[in-house]
From Swiss-Prot:
It comes from Methanococcus aeolicus (strain ATCC BAA-1280 / DSM 17508 / OCM 812 / Nankai-3). Its EC number is 3.1.-.-. Belongs to the eukaryotic release factor 1 family. Pelota subfamily. The lineage of its organism: Archaea, Methanobacteriati, Methanobacteriota, Methanomada group, Methanococci. This is Protein pelota homolog. The N-terminal domain has the RNA-binding Sm fold. It harbors the endoribonuclease activity. Its cofactor is a divalent metal cation. It is found in: Cytoplasm.
Length: 348
């Protein structure tokens, strides 16, 4: 995310999202009734020909809408903000409905009552863009799954199946192993920076040996770790363990995973945790909240209630973390009511 311009007296910040993560951050910053302005395509009627209602010309115009619907669409790589037009060219009717498609590398101006956590989120997104992509390969002797870890969740970018069979002779087995490793490399190679390869058993060690013999330049970029599981279970194990943070520095999704798992652990032993709005409010009365966890969905639907809670937590020196429901731990927190708190000390 690039913060291009700030106009504090008008509560306007102009930004340029650079990737999908930035669009997701903006989907949590832009709220209903916020003013969103950008260059956009708008179909205007051809006044010279009234015979055909479907005629008109699409042209690029700069206009603003009062946000009514905000939809993050990972598949089309855009954030759609719909609402009545509040300003634009003279020939565009004020109050008519329009959808602005916010896409990477296109400027957008947002006018709203900026909260402290909104500004922090912009700053986090700005810093995140400077970090390399986090690539994790979970593999064993039958298949390998390659994931890219984003701020808002995980995307599978490759799944490779081994064609190794015990029915093959040793020479054919060696060749199938090489084919398997090369297919994994083909998915890994385009990404810069460190790559984490993890999994149970010895296959990852054999892959490491293959890299040391044939691809020493790639070996320097790869870190190998052990897990008990493959696939998404193996990935969850990696995120929970903190390995990703040790390799890449603090990663948002890894931090979220560890915090929600800590919350679940404390709940299971009736320890330093509460969940649900009423219990969180009660813990705040004792100034006991150390870390407040809220899902992005719950925040969007209950902004006014949660603003007071977040401010109260910050007033006692605590912190608030917004958890993405695009990934498993966010869904777990959602099942608890969308809100929970880690405590400084136990309360009755």
């Amino acid at each position: 995310m690039k913060i291009i311009k700030e106009i504090p007296e008008k509560n306007i910040i102009k930004v340029m999202p650079e990737n999908l993560d930035d669009l997701w951050h903006l989907s949590n910053i832009i709220l209903k009734n916020n003013a969103v302005s950008a260059m956009t395509e708008r179909r205007t009627e051809d006044k010279g020909d009234k015979l055909r209602a479907d005629r008109g010309t699409k042209r690029r115009v700069y206009l603003g809408v009062k946000a009514e619907k905000i939809k993050f669409d990972e598949n089309t790589n855009r954030l759609r903000v719909s609402g009545p037009i509040i300003h634009g060219p003279e020939d565009v009717p004020i109050g008519s409905y329009h959808t602005i498609d916010i896409e990477p590398l296109k400027d957008v101006s947002i006018q709203k009552n900026w909260k402290k956590w909104d500004l922090q989120r912009l700053k986090d997104a700005e810093n995140s863009a400077k970090k390399p992509k986090i690539i994790v390969v979970i593999m064993d002797d039958s298949d390998a799954t390659v994931f890219i870890i984003r701020d808002y969740g995980v995307k599978e970018i490759g799944h490779i199946k081994s064609r190794l069979s015990k029915k093959l002779d040793y020479k054919r087995q060696d060749q199938e192993n090489i084919n398997y490793y090369n297919e994994i490399l083909e998915v890994m190679s385009p990404y810069e920076g460190k790559i984490l390869v993890a999994g149970p058993g010895f296959t990852k060690n054999n892959f490491q040996k293959y890299l040391s013999e044939k691809h020493k330049d790639m070996l320097q970029r790869v870190v190998f770790e052990s897990t008990n599981h493959t696939g998404r279970l193996g990935l969850a194990e990696v995120l929970k363990s903190g390995i990703v943070d040790r390799i890449y520095g603090e990663a948002r999704l890894s931090k979220e995973t560890q915090l929600v798992n800590k919350l679940l652990e404390e709940i299971s032993k009736k320890g330093l945790a509460v969940y649900g709005v009423d219990d969180v409010k009660n813990a705040l009365n004792y100034s006991a909240i150390e870390t407040l966890l809220i899902t992005d969905e719950f925040l969007r639907k209950n902004r006014r209630i949660l603003e007071d809670l977040i401010n109260s937590v910050e007033a006692i020196g605590g912190s608030s973390i917004i958890i993405s429901t695009e990934y498993d731990v966010g869904k777990q927190l959602k099942a608890l009511g969308g809100i929970g708190g880690l405590l400084r000390f136990p309360i009755e």
